Amino acid sequence: MKALYYNETNEKFLWPPPFGLSLRHHPFMGTKRKAKPAVDFKKTKPKLGKGKQPASNATDTSFKAKAIAMPQQSIMLDRSQTATTRRRQTLNDLIQQTHHPSSGARKDAVMGMLELVTTYQGFLEQNTTSLINTALPLIGDDDVHVRAAIARYFTNLLASIPDDTFAPYASSMLLMTSSAMSHISMFVRIDALQILSLLLDKVPSIATQDWESALDAKHSSDSHGQRILQAFFAMLGVAAGAQRARSGLVATSLSTTSVNLSASQRLTVLRSLYKFLCQAMRDSQSHGMPLWCFQSAFASPSDLEQFEQLFHHSSLEAHPWTIAHVPGASTHVVFENLMSAARVDQSVDAAPESIHERLAHVLHASLLSTLLDSLPAALAPDGSSSEVHADLVMHLLRIYLLLWRRIITLHIKSRATQGTNDVPIKSITQLEQLLAHLGPYFTGSIDGPHVRLELHVIYCELVSLCTMAAHERAPSKHLPSVLAFLQTLLTQNHAALTHNLYQALLPTFWLVLSTPIDGNVDILFALLAHFDTVQNRALHMVAFHFLARIAMLPTFRSLQVQVLPLYTPSLRAAWHTWILSLPRLLWQSATYAVSSRTSSSSEEEARAALTLAQHILEFLHCTLLPARHPLFEHEALVTELAPRVAPLFHVHHPKRGIVPGPYRKLPVPTQRMAEAVVQLIPISPLR
């Protein structure tokens, strides 16, 4: 291959190369280039539209600042004399933290305030306003953990605050609670019911104030009770029907499919609604014997009042009378009541609709649909039951029972005072419809769980209510199964009948005894025989009060119920045996009441035993005082009672001689009543 050589003079490539020019001097033959010298400053060519670029060695002096709150790390504050949490947070720090955007920080703030309350004695009394007002906005918080912490916080707080101290804050807390019950989220509404339950226990009168205005446009006051009841209507999907009823229109049965609640959520709503209605409709006899069923038995109001006062309280104690015992009312309210009572409408086809009847009509569609959905799971034919659905059915029937008990009680009162005996109740068909749906599930069996037995007891009382209100349209088809159930319960399974169930069955017992039907005499025989088998003192108290009232019914002149079949010669022997068993119960109760072995935990039982002894003495005195009694033979009764009452005063022991009975340790009023009984019986109490 030929090589070309470059001639610099002629600027041409030559071949062969000139003489004296070697190949290594040619520029293409591997000549090493010289390195360019380093440049101190490189000039950058500016680009169009970019502006002047900063120098590469320029120093950036700009800075950014961000404020963060770290109260727990503030080392400049002296907190040695301030109440702090384990994280060294004061109350002011926690109050600021309740507004934090993080839900975890808000929850920690609530638990921190609870820690301060439970740790430092007197801290709650000094900071009541701050502790309550700070936590109120968190009742309707969007986070479930914050709401759970708030429920726990107020549970401890309200249990420690006296009622008079909490009274100024009740309205604010009720307002925030009713607002949370109307929240767009159903979960917030459900959790707000926990706070409502606390308020119903703490301030029931304020929480249920003017609840009737939710169903009556005449009450225009915007009260707490109205807002809470309207929130319940919205939860159950009957708000539109309630608004129509409030305007005086007919509340149609509306669909409730728009409200999607699970079984547990609906149970929570119904449990809170039942508690709210119990507090709203409370009366003096809500926790005692249900005497409403006896209202139609007397033609004279004075006799009814005297009958209701029997065993109501100890008549041996003097109660001071003050002007506070007189109920107050404004003049125009008294005048309106007098004028309404004076008006007599002769052309009345149905009884006027009360607030309770209107409420039952509004809730009927929702309650009945839920009941029909839950009954198959709660009362399965094979005996199995779902706990949630069983509780759901229980609270549904309790609400029905509470409403219809009040409706029919007021109806019986109006019949007695206004003489409207033939006026029916407008919505009695709804109660009959309910019983028609419950009838197939009422087997009359007392075997199974306690919940099933309690459901049967509620069914029996609903049957008695419907029978008392319907007269000629009485659901007689339900009575035979009820009679069989009562007979089985009294004769075969004594352990299943508690004092609460016995008390709930009293209206049913009275319905059976006062109605001329086959089997009522057998029920009275079973009641008298069951009394001798009772071992529980609370059940003894309830059973004695009921049977004693039945025994004293013939002594009232205005009695308008046919009870003569209850005092036939065959039943007189059973009554005689029953009254002769009372001295033994008297001695047992008096001995337990004055026993020195009674511990402090059973002081309430001792007081109940003393009350029972006083009532037995009062009944014996009322029975023995008249020379003639429609039920008992006076001479035979006095002769047989004398040796049975004597152990109350003294006992003849074969070795120890005369041993004093519990009489000397009884309170003085009880001793005076015992001495009054002894004056009618030939024994001496002073031995």
How would you describe each model-predicted region?
Residues 26-84, 240-441:
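Acidic, serine/threonine- and proline-enriched intrinsically disordered linkers and terminal tails
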Residues 103-104, 144-148, 186-187, 263, ...:
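Alpha-helix N-cap/helix-start positions at coil->helix boundaries
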Residues 66-81, 110-122, 151-163, 200-219, ...:
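Boundary/linker elements of alpha-helical solenoid repeat scaffolds
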Residues 84-94, 123-138, 165-180, 205-238, ...:
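HEAT/HEAT-like alpha-solenoid repeats
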Residues 112-118, 138-139, 150-161, 177-181, ...:
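Hydrophobic residues within the alpha-helices of tandem HEAT/HEAT-like
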Residues 364-368, 373-687:
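Long alpha-helical repeat scaffolds
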Residues 98-101, 140-145, 182-184, 238-242, ...:
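Short coil turns that connect the paired helices of HEAT/ARM alpha-solenoid repeats
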Residues 63-134, 140-168, 351-374, 423-436, ...:
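Alpha-solenoid helical repeat scaffolds
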